[in-house]
């Protein structure tokens, strides 16, 4: 676990704008008309509509996406009763988590009131503002009364996350750990060390999942809770045992299958761990020091299935994989409550997710080759991008089925897409690419079949239904790797290009290539040798029509790939040059950037080809190009060197394509600021238009720009997309992720579809 110093923590919270959250306007406000609509007099209209029908508050205000994180500061993290104001940094932090994981807006509310009745009345009074209420850091037993009363008396979702968040995540972990251990929940003996809000809520949920009360022993600071003990709270009474033969943790733990600790550090010894049943499940959730350390538990017995609350060990029980998505599903159905059915739906969704193949982005975040379901991975990781869809959708369905939803979701695919877009996992353009590719999947050759990233991408592309993958590489190595990564190769062709069984194909390809390039110095023997190289072989598959598209680049430099592509595929006859483009999907919109990889120092003719290809490519993606050709000068302010080349290219393009919105040369700030450009240069062909296509003067500026934007923002980048080759040959780079390659595969498939349609005409 990363060591955090006091100085670093205080600096983090104080630097820049103090705190961690802010309110951001969601409507325009730059003109007087905007302000008149936002406030007086325009604001009166939605007020009157809400007066007539309070339900319309979900249509005209932020209520439907707004949660209150409310606390009185009586049980703050590991700090105890530090007061409402002192707990504000924690509540702001909770708001931050809601926003970054589920796109939910939060007001943190610190109520300086310990009396439960007065606290309840305060919360009820402000409840109309919110779509849901997350109670936080309120001590037991008051928290039980507060939550129960608010759930009864309000018509919006209310959840005390300290109780139910831990319960939901640990329940999902318990179901999966039991599956790994080969045990059934109704048969296991469970020992719970701790009797606070979290412990009792966890144990109640275990019972709801099938655990038997008579198989559960709960302990508090005095030992095993027995039914003959006087003055028990209602929650302790519920789990009090009639047994009189056990009093201590050491006695209770003998032969137990499950240990749940929500107490204090270092209370479970190695001897106690060893006294448990075979394949024991140990959830040591005290923070920051667990009841038994991960190292001690594993050293005491190798068959233990272990979870802690810490991120530096496997199977972390972390509430963040629950509460954002539970509220997301509740808000999206305008639910009146978060009920048991919704909580159980979340449990099963989280548990099921851990059994699915893990996205590459998760593996990369934890620097592992591949997480697979088992002793070291039975709870999903907080960074898993599927949580927003799987858990939110399960909760929303449960809300509808249990009758607490006021709004029904009818199109679940559309809802899933909206959730992905909400978190920036999917843009409209990406979705269109996939949908188009699915209509006519093509045969796509993946050059580096033995590379884990390429293999995962091919499998994912197949699962998405966008292509029929063909992997190049040693079939035995690929099959072994697929087994290690727990990937199915069903429906995926593997070609071992260097095997004797491919000799005839290599010879045929060599003859075709040597004949094609006979006047460029090629001979049959050299061509034969080249067919043992994956790029030559794969591109020849496309050239001969035995495949439709080709993806390469994880093992090969661009310069080498470009050389082979020119040799085998060639440039389209209407151009003398080819280039590449990257697409940037930002919050401001979609931008097309060229040339990002090929032409180092383009002259005027090369820039003209890049501009032509960019126009064609942007139109290929169903956008209308509005193109700025960039330089460090503006419209002839410098008449030498690079600006002059760009200037001449613009002149040519404007004459040849009078309908095209293109101008330059110009600096990038004028290209992207329409108001500034129109004020200073009102004569341009771009007047009043938002630029979406940027042609850079050289490779250095284009390449640096797209990588800078990719590194410093949340912009989705698709590319490189080749422009100008005769066939669909596309490149990746050595740092490409699985998602990058799948995106390029979708582009390659559409490229192949368009190519075939042209030839049919």
Where do the language-model regions lie?
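N-terminal ligand-binding/catalytic initiation module
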Residues: 1-158, 353, 397-398, 431-455, ...
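Adenosine-phosphate binding glycine-rich loop
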Residues: 2, 161-162, 181-183, 284-392, ...
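Helix-enriched interaction subdomains in cytosolic or periplasmic regions
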Residues: 12-45, 390-423, 559-562, 593-596
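Glycine-rich adenosine-cofactor-binding loop
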Residues: 66-78, 83, 167-170, 181-207
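Anion-binding alpha/beta catalytic cores of soluble intermediary-metabolism enzymes, centered on
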Residues: 85, 137-184, 406-409, 415-761
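NAD(P)-binding Rossmann-fold cofactor-contacting core
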Residues: 193, 209-236
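Rossmann-like adenosine-cofactor binding region
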Residues: 237-304, 310-312
